[in-house]
Amino acid sequence: MSDIDKESLKQNQKQWENEVELGESREANQDDELLMSLGYKPEFTREFSYVSIFGQSFGSMGLCPAMAGSLIFSMNCGGGGMVWSWIIGCICLIPVSISLGELASSMPTSGGLYFWIFTLASPSSRAFLCWVCGYVSVLGYATIYASTVYSASSMVQALAVIGSPSYSPTKYEQYGIYAALLFVISAMTAIPSRVIAKVNIINITFQFLVSIILIIALAAGSDSTTRNSGSFIFGDFTNYSGWSNMGWAFILSFTTPVWVVSGFESSAAVAEESTNAAKAAPFAMISSLGVATILGWCIVITVVATMGHDFNAILGSSLGQPVAQVLVNNVGNKGALGIFSLLVIALCLNCISLLIAASREVFAFCRDGGIPGSRYLRLLTKQKVPLNAILLVLLYSLLVGLLILVNVTAISSVFNLAIIALYIAYSGPLMCRFVYNKFQPGVFYVGKWSKPAALWSLVWMWFMILMLLFPQYQKPNQDEMNWAIVVLGFVMVFCVVYYYLPKIGGKTFFTGPIPTVQQENEYISGVPLNELSLSSLPLPKDFDQKQITE
């Protein structure tokens, strides 16, 4: 190749790089202008691409490890119950992802749910509704994170038992593991957005690999003693629940799918860190749920196909984890130790994604003064990390984790609490959309199917809320009660009392989302006038600056 050709190639490459950079700059400017039109000054750097924001949603599910930690809830009515509750539960959530995706496209802010409800509600009620929704959504995100870390701590203990069968774990040791994981994950999450975006891509790859490894290992390692027939996989409905009614036992099995895939909406929490957020956020919600539905069903079918007929032995296993026992039965202790270790790592990556979403939700609500101490909690580090918000979620998780010291039933109710709080928060803006009819569609909108999808979402979520408030046993004693209603009730009472408290209550200072931008006419293409220069504007390639200077 001649020197002229090389020089021409370099020039073309440089021109292409400049055009890509200019395109990204224009896209970022459009995102920032949309955010400023909603009243907020851009404070995060936009490092999340379509792939990394998909990773945020899909990674928040932690599909395979989350299923491994929660399949015990879907074993209420046999193999068929496990298989069909998963696919039905996930399909019923698709309209929810569409409805929330429309809201995220219309109003792509980290405030998400409580900002949406403020925009869609009436002027007379929107401040109070926004206040309640803010508290409930923060509770939901923080609790789904805490429940996932608890699941990880249970899996760590199962690993210890697999490696040393004589080991007998205690609840105090589990709380110690739980607390240690909280501190480690908090430290791993206090990193800049550009690093988190790369971690999300790693998370996607690792989650898929672990899922494939689990499916192949169980299928290859099973034999005639553990392998089940198709009629058992799809048609066995034996009642193993604490309820006598088979129909209700099947409904209780929905706890697993609604808990596992609950992270699909977390892309809205990082909308202010995403490029082309109005399209990317709904894309991540819907596509991640679709992938999880199919891949998760394959995992459930494989587990049921290789777990044998003796459910009682698996449920009563000393490992405390059904999937761990299924692995031991099929691939032996050493194989189970290796594969289950991968599941624990995958679940920790899942926890990172969940803490990212929870901390952004806390930051956004504190930016609007919703939580006591917001002046400090909303601060960002020099690297644009909401460290104080992360620490608040850490403190809450340490406190709610004390339920470990009560009993397994008490801490298991945290799984229910997470979904209940999130579903209440999800349903708020959808209800306001029907009542006040103020919704303005964004670039993602399904037209005539929009309202039916929103209506179905409300029906399904409130049905699930009622189901999750029930205890695991038909006639529970004090130790078997569902603690979800206790924690939820405490938070609801606190936020309502704090709002109406004379002189210092939220009603005296909280008016909803607080605009943080300068006046609209002080911005051009997302740049403040006092910082404006030709180099800061997305000018065409053939623009000649001499035309102005001359």
Curated annotation (Swiss-Prot):
InterPro entries noted in UniProt: AA/rel_permease1 (IPR002293), Amino_acid_permease_CS (IPR004840)
PROSITE patterns the UniProt entry points to: AMINO_ACID_PERMEASE_1 (PS00218)
Region spans: Disordered: 1-24
Pfam family, one: AA_permease_2
Membrane topology field: Multi-pass membrane protein
Gene Ontology cellular-component annotations: membrane
GO MF annotation list: amino acid transmembrane transporter activity; gamma-aminobutyric acid transmembrane transporter activity
BP terms from Gene Ontology: amino acid transmembrane transport; gamma-aminobutyric acid transport
Cellular compartments annotated: Membrane
Keyword Transmembrane helix listed: yes
Chain ranges passing through the membrane: 53-73, 78-98, 127-147, 177-197, 201-221, 246-266, 283-303, 336-356, 386-406, 411-431, 453-473, 481-501
Keywords: Amino-acid transport, Membrane, Transmembrane, Transmembrane helix, Transport
Family under the similarity heading: Belongs to the amino acid-polyamine-organocation (APC) superfamily.
Name listed for the protein in its UniProt record: Uncharacterized amino-acid permease C11D3.08c
Organism: Schizosaccharomyces pombe (strain 972 / ATCC 24843) (Fission yeast)
